A protein has these predicted regions:
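A short helix-to-beta-strand connector/capping loop
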Residues: 98-106, 224-231
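Active-site beta->alpha loop and helix N-cap motifs at the rims of alpha/beta catalytic domains
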Residues: 79-90, 98, 110, 114
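Gly/Ser-rich helix-loop-strand patches that form or flank binding pockets
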Residues: 2, 11, 29-31, 107, ...
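Well-ordered, non-membrane alpha-helical segments in soluble/globular domains
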Residues: 87-91, 145, 216
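Charged docking surfaces used in two-component/phosphorelay signaling
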Residues: 109-117, 237-241
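Short glycine/proline- and acidic residue-enriched helix-loop micro-motifs
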Residues: 71-81
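Small/aliphatic-rich secondary-structure junction motif
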Residues: 2-73, 170-234, 242, 253, ...
């Protein structure tokens, strides 16, 4: 995890904030700063000027359509100017939040395909990176999530928010599906709880009663008899993922920590039900 590198004083422990538009989600940016603050790491704000926009502007038939339905010719110079102003504005916004949280910040601007730019940034200074997506991920864009995990190798986790995100303060909800993920999630949750406030709550997620009983035994054995941590059980055969998101909402969750490729977020990246109800950031570990 990123915390091991950050605590050792190495420069590679960082949060890479992926900025690709002029309308990032405020909760996503705040969450990225909070993760860096919790793990004593730095932030690299990576603003990507989408190369496809420049290619499009090179065509003589390219037009920009305003909200009032007016059109005008789209030139490469116009795109370059707007991108530069947008990037400067976003970098100042991130800088203000990072300074207030006493988090070191590096700013970088590249012109590339957004996913490839992220992959290159993490490969150049990795592998202990947490990627934070500044744009809210729409529920129907789960395939993009799978693409990121498959393409961007130099990461230990990915933070994202959905369109309903509204807070980062509150309980840290660790959704545990296997004993192997317990300790990394627990350490991450405890670090984040000290910064964000609230308690760490473990939700044991399974798909059958037998799996639930086995996981419960393994988790309690690992925690020890003296642990006072709040433990909850949830079986996916009971209802849809949206109902689990409702449980998290009622717990006043400020962050959810989960595992990519499991029951919470399947490998196909289907987030439709979960993101229609989730009101806090989702921190996915590999």
């Amino acid at each position: 995890m990123i915390m091991h590198v950050a605590e050792a004083g190495e420069r590679r422990g960082r949060v890479v904030l992926h900025l690709t538009s002029g309308h990032p989600n405020a909760i996503a940016i705040e969450a990225a700063v909070r993760i860096a603050q919790a793990f004593n790491s730095e932030i690299e704000s990576l603003f990507v000027e989408d190369l496809q926009l420049y290619d499009l502007a090179s065509y003589p038939f390219a037009r920009e359509i305003s909200l009032s339905a007016r059109t005008r010719a789209l030139s490469r110079d116009d795109v370059e100017k707007e991108m530069r102003l947008c990037g400067q504005s976003l970098q100042r916004r991130v800088e203000t939040l990072a300074r207030a949280a006493d988090v070191p910040l590096r700013a970088k601007v590249v012109r590339d395909d957004p996913v490839q730019a992220l992959a290159k940034a993490c490969a150049e200074d990795g592998p202990w990176n947490v990627v934070a997506l500044a744009d809210a991920l729409p529920p129907g864009q789960g395939a993009r999530l799978s693409e990121l995990f498959n393409t961007v190798a130099g990461t230990t986790g990915l933070m994202l928010v959905g369109p309903m995100a509204r807070r980062t303060r509150g309980s840290i909800i660790a959704v545990v599906e296997t004993p192997e993920h317990l300790q990394p999630m627990l350490r991450a949750g405890e670090r984040m709880a000290r910064v964000l406030g609230g308690e760490v709550v473990l939700i044991m997620l399974s798909d059958s009663q037998s799996s639930d009983e086995w996981l419960d035994g393994q988790v309690r054995l690992a925690l020890g008899e003296q642990s006072r941590m709040r433990l909850l059980h949830y079986r996916t055969d009971q209802s849809a993922p949206a109902a689990l998101a409702e449980v998290i909402r009622r717990l006043n969750g400020g962050f959810v920590i989960g595992h990519f490729g499991g029951l919470l977020v399947p490998a196909d990246g289907d987030l439709r039900d979960l993101f229609t109800a989730l009101e806090c950031p989702l921190f996915l570990m590999r």
